[in-house]
Every structure is written in C-alpha cells, then in structure tokens.
C-alpha cells in the first residue's frame, strides 16, 4: 500500500546520545535495557551485542552500585552502541559513571535527592558533554507530590519533571530529554501531551511495567501509538517482561505500522480460513524465523487464496497468492511465476532475499549520491 503517513512530528531540540541523534528531524530511536547482572561484564556485553544485531539504537544499563559503575566502564570499552546509565538514589554513582565514560545519564527525580545533588550531576554532565534524561515514573514520585495529589496523576508526573527541568534551566543546561512513564496508558498519554506543549526537548516514550510479551506489546502499541499519531516522541522503549530483543522487534513494528521508520520485512498476511491453498500460519512462522536477519525495508504479502490475494500482492514488493493447483508469485506488483506447496517456503525465501539485496543496492546507491 502507498498511502502516505499523515503524522506531523512535534518540533524538538536535537541532542546526541553517543553518535545517535535524538530529536529534531532524526529518525525515532528504538532502545531497550539489559536485564543481566551489570557486574557480569561478559553477559552484559553479550546481551548488548545481541540487541545491536536486533536493531537497537541505544541501550540502557542499570548501575545500582559503585561496583556496577566500575563494571559499566569495562562494558563501555567493549561495545560500540551508545549506553545510558540508569541511576537511582545515589548521585555519586552518576558522577563516577560520568568520569569513566557514558553516553547519557538517566536520573529519577523521585529518588535522586536534594537539589545540590542534581547540581553536581549537571556539572559533571556539562564538563563531559553528556546528555541527561529526566526519567519520571509514576511508581516513584517524590513524597510531597504523592501527598499533594493523593495518587499518581498526569499532573503529578508533569510537575515532577518540570521541577527538575527548572533546575537544569537555572544552570543553563539544555542537553537533556524527558520521560514520564506510568503503567496506565491513559495517564501516560495525558502526561506526555501536557509536557509536549511546555518544553522543546526530546521526549522518550514508554509505558512502564507494561506486562508480559503479549499484554505488554498490546498496551505499548496502544499507548505509544496514540502519542506517535500526535507527532509526540523522539525515542521509544517497549517495556516487556520478556527477552529484551522482543522489545526491539515490537518497537520497530510499532514505528513500521505508523510509517515512521522502516526496518526489515513488513509482512501482509491473512489470518487463514478454509479457502487457503497452503498452510498460511505455518508458512508465515517459517518465513519470519528465516528472514529475521534482513534489515532492508520490504513489503511481502502472504495470502492464502484469490479473494484478496491478487489485490494485496499487487501492492507489495513480493507477493504470494494461494491457488490451485499452484500458487502465484508476484514481483513488483505483477504476476511472475507459480510455485507448488512442496517447494514454497524455500523458493519464496530465496526470492525475497534476492529482492531485498537488489533494493539495498538501490538504497546504497542513493545514499552514495547524497
């Protein structure tokens, strides 16, 4: 399909997280967080590299202790992906991480402590050119805000963020981004909509503690989708109680669905019914597994019968329409050849890879021309 996205992104100030631009006209960055023990350097490095292979732009790493800060330094030396140090409670850990090297510091207004501690972090970040993320979370609001509002509300999240933004402003520090996360979709969306009109800094989106793989993916798709449709959001994290790689995959699927960023294959597949001329579900599962390594944006239609098959296949780069006795393959929107069921997956995979390689050559040539 060639319907253009109607989304007009919110204007925001651009910052750099390592070599990755965030905000402005930069692509929306997709990030995740390690769930290894940070002091286990080898395991953490391995997970970061796996996330990088999955397409992560940025990875956040929890740094709960000084020992973890030293481990973080070793991790940073072994990876190329920008790393965000996740700091809670002890501002001195942030100072140490800034000293040993980090691409961004995440601090939580609800537990980082007094203003003088925030000032110390700002000073260290300014000296090293490190951006800060003000990461507000509904589950850890300041005690006075909990008392004032009685419970987490969008207004409480925004007030928490604005307090710390005021501190940054008074110290002439504009190199920051903001997040306001809750596990409730409506609270999160309302908070982001409020603050989007008050500041020009980039916004990092997320539904915190969203749930397991299925429920968390759905909740995140709805919440982030609502904000992204409004043009709000410069970087996203899909929080799942699952393999962090799934966070990256779901994140890209959300952006792909809204035509905000393309990576890998966009499958158009029917849910199957008794009219199918091949096993659609089995074929789709096999193709997705085999083609995970392809990063080139490509539309692939997999439709089990001739009701909608030809129409969908004509709009895709490569299409498969079920038929009897043979299935019809479309290339570039036109019927090309037929395939029998016994050779379907292998031959169709080969065709998709060939088409992806050709398209990547075209994209590379365009980039080379500038």
From Swiss-Prot:
Keywords, comma-separated and alphabetical: 4Fe-4S, Iron, Iron-sulfur, Isoprene biosynthesis, Metal-binding, Oxidoreductase
Textual note on the cofactor: Binds 1 [4Fe-4S] cluster.
Annotated EC: 1.17.7.3
Metabolic or biological pathway, per its Swiss-Prot or TrEMBL entry: Isoprenoid biosynthesis; isopentenyl diphosphate biosynthesis via DXP pathway; isopentenyl diphosphate from 1-deoxy-D-xylulose 5-phosphate: step 5/6
GO biological process: isopentenyl diphosphate biosynthetic process, methylerythritol 4-phosphate pathway; terpenoid biosynthetic process
Top-rank taxon, per record: Bacteria
GO-annotated molecular function: 4 iron, 4 sulfur cluster binding; 4-hydroxy-3-methylbut-2-en-1-yl diphosphate synthase activity (ferredoxin); 4-hydroxy-3-methylbut-2-enyl-diphosphate synthase activity (flavodoxin); iron ion binding
Catalytic activity: (2E)-4-hydroxy-3-methylbut-2-enyl diphosphate + oxidized [flavodoxin] + H2O + 2 H(+) = 2-C-methyl-D-erythritol 2,4-cyclic diphosphate + reduced [flavodoxin]
One Pfam family hit: GcpE
Reported cofactor(s): [4Fe-4S] cluster
InterPro entries: Dihydropteroate_synth-like_sf (IPR011005), IspG_bac (IPR016425), IspG_bac-typ (IPR004588), NO2/SO3_Rdtase_4Fe4S_sf (IPR045854)
Binding residues for [4Fe-4S] cluster: 270, 273, 305, 312
Family under the similarity heading: Belongs to the IspG family.
Function, as annotated: Converts 2C-methyl-D-erythritol 2,4-cyclodiphosphate (ME-2,4cPP) into 1-hydroxy-2-methyl-2-(E)-butenyl 4-diphosphate.
Protein name (record): 4-hydroxy-3-methylbut-2-en-1-yl diphosphate synthase (flavodoxin)
Name of the gene: ispG
């Amino acid at each position: 399909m060639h319907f253009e996205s109607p989304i007009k992104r919110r204007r925001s100030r651009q910052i750099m997280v390592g070599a990755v631009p965030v905000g402005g006209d930069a692509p929306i960055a997709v990030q995740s967080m390690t769930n290894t023990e940070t002091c286990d350097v080898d395991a953490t490095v391995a997970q970061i590299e796996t996330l990088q292979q999955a397409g992560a732009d940025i990875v956040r790493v929890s740094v709960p202790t000084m020992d973890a800060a030293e481990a973080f330094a070793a991790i940073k030396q072994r990876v190329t992906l920008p790393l965000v140090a996740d700091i809670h409670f002890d501002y001195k850990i942030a100072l140490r991480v800034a000293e040993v090297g980090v691409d961004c510091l995440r601090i939580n207004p609800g537990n980082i402590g007094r203003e003088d501690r925030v000032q110390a972090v700002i000073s260290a970040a300014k000296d090293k050119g490190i951006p800060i993320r003000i990461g507000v979370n509904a589950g850890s609001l300041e005690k006075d805000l909990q008392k004032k509002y009685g419970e987490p509300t969008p207004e409480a999240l925004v007030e928490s963020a604005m307090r710390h933004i005021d501190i940054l402003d008074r110290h002439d520090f504009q190199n920051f981004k903001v997040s306001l996360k809750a596990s409730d979709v409506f609270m999160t969306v309302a908070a982001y909509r409020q603050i989007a009109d008050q500041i020009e800094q980039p916004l990092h989106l997320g539904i915190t503690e969203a749930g397991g793989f299925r429920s968390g993916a759905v909740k995140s798709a709805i919440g982030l989708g609502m904000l992204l449709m409004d043009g709000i959001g410069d970087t996203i994290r899909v929080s799942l109680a699952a393999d962090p790689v799934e966070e990256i995959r779901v994140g890209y699927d959300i952006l792909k669905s809204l035509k905000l960023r393309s990576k890998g294959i966009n499958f158009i597949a029917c849910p199957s019914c008794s009219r199918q001329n091949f096993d659609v579900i089995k074929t789709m599962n096999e193709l997705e597994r085999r083609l995970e390594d392809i990063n080139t944006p490509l539309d692939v239609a997999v439709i089990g019968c001739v009701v909608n098959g030809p129409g969908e296949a004509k709009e895709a780069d490569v299409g498969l329409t079920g038929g009897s006795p043979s299935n019809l393959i479309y290339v570039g929107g036109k019927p090309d050849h037929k395939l029998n069921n016994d050779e379907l997956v292998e031959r169709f995979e080969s065709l998709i890879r060939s088409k992806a390689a050709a398209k990547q050559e075209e994209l590379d040539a365009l980039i080379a021309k500038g």
